[in-house]
UniProtKB/Swiss-Prot annotation:
This is Far upstream element-binding protein 2. It is found in: Nucleus; Cytoplasm. It comes from Rattus norvegicus (Rat). There is a cross-link at residue 122 (Glycyl lysine isopeptide (Lys-Gly) (interchain with G-Cter in SUMO2)). The lineage of its organism: Eukaryota, Metazoa, Chordata, Craniata, Vertebrata. Residues 8-17, 398-408, 502-521, 529-543, 588-614 have a biased composition (Pro residues). The gene is Khsrp. There is a cross-link at residue 122 (Glycyl lysine isopeptide (Lys-Gly) (interchain with G-Cter in SUMO1)).
Length: 721
């Protein structure tokens, strides 16, 4: 046995058969220990008998006796077993304790209370404190827990829970906080969420909830907390929908409420409880920015008011009302005309009518697209009338008058509107270099599809070979209205970075070649009525009265196609032009004529006059017939009487003809064709049709020098395609 004392006499000889204390019973100490306690002291058999037990002796036991040593060994074993149990619970390896090393807590300490004369109760209390101090770090005090009520939007609960509870489980695992969502919001816009855990865990769970709600609303993460829990950035407003009118707000298949949400930029929830009576008013919850919520409320009330006035859901000649607007069907090939270049036309309609117009997205298979007009009912109807008038003008437009001399068949002036179209609609054929066809078609045909969608025309590559059989060119066909073809032509020219070359007269080509009138840019190249503003100059161009009816003038439908005339036109160009005149001039033309003919160009100074080319047809009679038919149109009622400029223009062109032939004022016109009568008749009829008041100076024929310059520009103008 080891000696735990630091001083005193050495221990006596061991007893012959028993415990280490000799006659333990004589000491007057406590009763002997349990039977197994003698293992350390080497006591003999028996418990409590003579020499056995190893029980600690009484106070009279001398220091260094066997009793205190046995007591200390039992305590050390208990501490060691407690440490091993704690190590197993904590998952750490058990620590082996060496009782004989000074590192153990009791190896080098004095037995102050043991050696003193303190009572036993104080000794046991001190031993208990020592055990508690060693077992304390094994079981740390539990952390503080808290429970907080948090509120989230009722509509975001499903997003927070996730599919199969995946999202809420992730929140609990990542934050270490228990999340419990209330089963019902009680009709309120927010639902209560109970968060239980340590303060830092609760805070982390709140941040994760904020991120989920912010992403669900389409905003950046972390911006919901202030909105949903007392902030001012979001507004929730409820309005009561009268019984039986909830279907008006929802619409067929939810179409109306979807349109309201898209137009106002808010979220709408119509709270419907299956247990409620159908005759009970139902709340409509609107969530969004304050001004958007207010706008949405007004839109909903407008729908309800229209229903009360008997106007909701009624159809008229312009389309069907949906959500306070009007739907107008527009032929797919005419969408580009309604929109206009760079959206100019649709912007003008919106500004004039005070509405908003949007084309609904569709699959592109139907023959029409729907233009949805939004605004007050009277303004919507006004915009619908404008669109329908525009579409009607596209269905009937004026036939184009003859084009410029030498104008290639099937072509049209680019950008300025000098050329005009003949028969309505139709198609045009152009040749494009083979190596640039891919730019027009695009990968998978995406470029040509985009051109068709933007312009409303139909562009395709022709299987026919070019007229000269050149393999380096391909033919493209564009079908549609003149405006659509022109728009598609410009887009193709931008793709190939060059002009298109028209090929052959096709259906809907231009009018026949004829004398070209003076150049005056303007819509549809109406002739210049009215008196000339400057002395010696030609009459200026006067625009027709502003109005939607004049934007796209009406034209008469053509007569049935004659195959005999078509065959003759294919073989003989003159026969083709003659067929054109006989076909189109037998019917009354539209109210707005095309460009007027121009006088022949005078020869340059010092050069002899050139005789007219041989084989060139004389279109003088055709022009006279053309303007006579135009003159048959009655004058507009209420228009003031117009001054007749016939004589002034006749005199002007006579002088031009004399100068062109090299003669003086009294010289005969010679072989040069005289268009004086045609011009005079044209301007007289134009002045009568448009109702323009004459200028203050009256008709003043232009000077000879300016007239020469005008005629030279007219005949020397090159038509760029």
């Amino acid at each position: 046995m080891s000696d735990y004392s630091t001083g005193g006499p050495p221990p006596g000889p061991p007893p012959p058969a028993g415990g280490g204390g000799g006659a333990a019973g004589a000491g007057g100490g406590p009763p002997p220990g349990p039977p197994g306690a003698g293992d350390r002291g080497g006591g003999g058999p028996g418990g409590g008998g003579p020499g056995g037990g190893g029980a600690s002796g009484g106070p009279s036991q001398p220091p260094g006796g066997g009793g205190p040593g046995i007591r200390k060994d039992a305590f050390a074993d208990a501490v060691q077993r407690a440490r091993q149990i704690a190590a197993k619970i904590g998952g750490d390896a058990a620590t082996t304790v060496n009782n004989n090393t000074p590192d153990f807590g009791f190896g080098g300490q004095k037995r102050q209370l043991e050696d003193g004369d303190q009572p036993d109760s104080k000794k046991l209390a001190s031993q208990g404190d020592s055990i508690g101090s060693q077992l304390g770090p094994i079981h740390p005090p539990p952390r503080t827990s808290m429970t907080e009520e948090y509120r989230v939007p009722d509509g975001m609960v499903g997003l927070i829970i996730g599919r199969g509870g995946e999202q809420i489980n992730k929140i609990q695992q990542d934050s270490g906080c228990k999340v419990q969502i209330s089963p019902d919001s009680g009709g309120l816009p927010e639902r209560s969420v109970s968060l239980t855990g340590a303060p830092e865990s609760v805070q982390k769970a709140k941040m994760m909830l904020d991120d989920i709600v912010s992403r669900g609303r389409g905003g950046p993460p972390g911006q919901f907390h202030d909105n949903a829990n007392g902030g001012q950035n979001g507004t929730v407003q409820e309005i009561m929908i009268p019984a039986g009118k909830a279907g008006l707000v929802i619409g067929k298949g939810g179409e109306t409420i979807k349109q309201l949400q898209e137009r106002a930029g808010v979220k709408m929830i119509l709270i419907q409880d299956g247990s409620q009576n159908t005759n009970v008013d139902k709340p409509l919850r609107i969530i969004g920015d304050p001004y958007k919520v207010q706008q949405a409320c007004e839109m909903v009330m407008d729908i309800l008011r229209e229903r009360d006035q008997g106007g909701f859901g009624d159809r008229n000649e312009y389309g069907s009302r949906v959500g306070g607007g009007i739907d107008v069907p527009v032929p797919r090939h005419s969408v580009g005309v309604v929109i206009g270049r760079s959206g100019e036309m649709i912007k003008k309609i919106q500004n004039d009518a005070g509405v908003r117009i949007q084309f609904k997205q569709d699959d592109g298979t139907g023959p029409e697209k729907i233009a949805h007009i939004m605004g007050p009912p009277d303004r919507c109807e006004h915009a619908a009338r404008i669109i329908n008038d525009l579409l009607q003008s596209l269905r009937s437009g004026p036939p184009g008058p003859p084009g410029a001399p030498g104008m290639p068949p099937g072509g049209r002036g680019r950008g300025r509107g000098q050329g005009n179209w003949g028969p309505p609609g139709g198609e045009m054929t152009f040749s494009i270099p083979t190596h640039k066809c891919g730019l027009v078609i695009g990968r998978g045909g995406e470029n040509v599809k985009a051109i068709n969608q933007q312009t409303g025309a139909f562009v395709e590559i022709s299987r026919q070979l070019p007229p000269n059989g050149d393999p380096n060119f391909k033919l493209f066909v564009i079908r549609g209205s003149p405006q659509q073809i022109d728009h598609a032509k410009q887009l193709i020219e931008e793709k190939i970075e060059g002009p298109l070359c028209p090929v052959g007269p096709g259906p809907g080509g231009p009018g026949p070649a004829g004398p070209m009138g003076p150049f005056h840019p303007g819509p549809f190249n109406q002739g210049p009525p009215g008196a000339p503003p400057h002395a010696g100059g030609p009459p200026p161009h006067q625009y027709p009265p502003q109005g939607w009816g004049n934007t796209y003038p009406e034209w008469q439908p053509p007569a049935p196609h004659d195959p005999n005339k078509a065959a003759a036109a294919a073989t003989d160009p003159n026969a083709a032009w003659a067929a054109y005149y006989s076909h189109y001039y037998q019917q009354p033309p539209g109210p707005v004529p095309g460009p007027a003919p121009a006088p022949a160009a005078p020869p340059a100074q010092g050069e002899p006059p050139q005789p007219p080319p041989t084989g060139q047809s004389d279109y003088t009679k055709a022009w006279e017939e053309y303007y006579k038919k135009i003159g048959q149109q009655p004058q507009q009622p209420g228009a003031p009487p117009q001054q007749d400029y016939t004589k002034a223009w006749e005199e002007y062109y006579k002088k031009q003809a004399q100068v062109a032939t090299g003669g003086g004022p009294g010289a005969p016109p010679g072989s040069q064709p005289d268009y004086s009568a045609a011009w005079a008749e044209y301007y007289r009829q134009q002045a009568a049709y448009y109702g323009q008041t004459p200028g203050p100076g009256g008709p003043q024929p232009p000077s000879t020098q300016q007239g020469q310059q005008q005629a030279t520009e007219a005949n020397g103008y090159e038509l760029h395609l």
